[in-house]
Every structure is written in C-alpha cells, then in structure tokens.
C-alpha cells in the first residue's frame, strides 16, 4: 500500500506521486506518516520534508503551510517548496552565512524576525542539499 501525495505551491504543483512514508516538518515537530494514518490536518513549519519512494529518501524543502491526510491521500498546501535536487549546496551555504550576518546586524525587531526567517529557510536548504548528496 502507498500514500498518494500532492504538494501544491501557489505557482505550481511541486509533487504528485506515490510514496511509502513521509516525514513532515509540522509546527509541533517532525511528523511521520505511513499508510493507514488517521485523518489529520496539521500546520507545517519551514523545514525539510522527507519522502520515501521504494527504498530511497528524497528531501524537499517546505516553506510552511498545511497538510491534510485522509484515506491514504496526503495533500500539502505550502507557501513555497524546493526539491533538494534543484539546490546548489555552496549557494545555500552562502545564503545561510548572509542570513546569519543579517541577524547579527539587525537592530529592530522587524529586522530580527525577517533575518530569523531567512536563516530558517537557508538552514532547511542546506540540510536538504546535504541529505541529497549523501
């Protein structure tokens, strides 16, 4: 048995396929989904979703959103998403360094919040790209 997964971003359908297992970055921590999971609606955080197809794990960066599972159908609505295969690790590491510098230079609360969000996104991209190459 498999899960039917559909990841939808505002500009495109990122993923529409079957998988055996999913690990989601929910707002309360990592959430594992297997076939036969109870119906659920959950908020997603910025982070790396891991999809197991056959015996291979594929990381996908999610930029927050919502996930609904019912009858082995997982629908994920996200603010943005990026497959690890599309991420340049050196560029992602550079973006993380830049975001970290922005946070240390931030003086207002707004600047700190924006820099923190950039760091979270950059960390997720580095994590996904690293996982894809190992």
From Swiss-Prot:
Originating species: Pyropia yezoensis
Plastid found in the keyword field: yes
UniProt lineage: Eukaryota, Rhodophyta, Bangiophyceae, Bangiales, Bangiaceae
Keywords associated with the record: ATP synthesis, CF(1), Chloroplast, Hydrogen ion transport, Ion transport, Membrane, Plastid, Thylakoid, Transport
Pfam entry (one): ATP-synt_DE_N
A GO molecular-function annotation: proton-transporting ATP synthase activity, rotational mechanism
Identification of the protein by name: ATP synthase epsilon chain, chloroplastic
Compartments it resides in: Plastid, Chloroplast thylakoid membrane
GO cellular component, one term: proton-transporting ATP synthase complex
């Amino acid at each position: 048995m498999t899960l039917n997964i559909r990841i939808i971003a505002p500009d495109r359908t990122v993923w529409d396929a079957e998988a055996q297992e999913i690990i989601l970055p929910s707002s309360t921590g990592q959430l594992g989904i297997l076939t036969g999971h109870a119906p659920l609606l959950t908020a997603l955080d910025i982070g790396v979703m891991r999809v197991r197809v056959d015996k291979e794990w594929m990381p996908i960066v999610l930029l927050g959103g919502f996930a609904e599972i019912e009858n082995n159908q997982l629908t994920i609505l996200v603010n943005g998403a990026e497959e690890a295969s599309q991420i340049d690790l050196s560029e992602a590491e550079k973006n993380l360094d830049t975001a970290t510098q922005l946070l240390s230079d931030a003086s207002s609360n707004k600047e700190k919040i924006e820099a923190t969000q950039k760091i979270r996104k950059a960390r997720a991209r580095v994590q996904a790209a690293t996982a894809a190459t190992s």
